[in-house]
């Protein structure tokens, strides 16, 4: 399993922990370092609400990425639509959204460095 270069915590709520799903989240988190190399930490919460314990019910994923001066938080509520396992789709979609936000943050951060100081 590829390990990211920053602290990563993957937690499961209201569902059994899945080593395969955790490894899947680790792989996606490791890819974030290719976009922005100053990530301080990342937290992933994967949960299935209490009233939806059966397989095929909605999965909620929250990805929180801490970078200098900001925290990027993305959530994905994925309802099944015939996909083999909606938890994997929700994790993938949340990390894709986090990646897009990191790209925007990196662009903004880069341009901020280019603006001359008025001091």
Where are the regions a protein language model picked out?
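N-terminal, polar/charged subdomain of small-to-medium soluble alpha/beta proteins
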Residues: 1-119
């Amino acid at each position: 399993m590829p390990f990211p270069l920053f602290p990563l915590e993957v937690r499961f709520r209201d569902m059994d922990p899945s080593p395969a799903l955790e490894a899947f989240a680790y792989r996606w988190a490791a890819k974030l370092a290719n976009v922005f190399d100053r990530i301080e930490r990342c937290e992933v919460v994967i949960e299935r609400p209490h009233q939806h314990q059966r397989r095929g019910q909605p999965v909620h994923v929250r990805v929180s990425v801490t970078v200098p001066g900001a925290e990027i938080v993305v959530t994905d509520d994925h309802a099944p639509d015939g996909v083999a396992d909606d938890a994997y789709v929700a994790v993938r979609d949340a990390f894709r959204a986090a990646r897009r936000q990191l790209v925007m943050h990196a662009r903004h951060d880069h341009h901020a460095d280019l603006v001359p100081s008025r001091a």
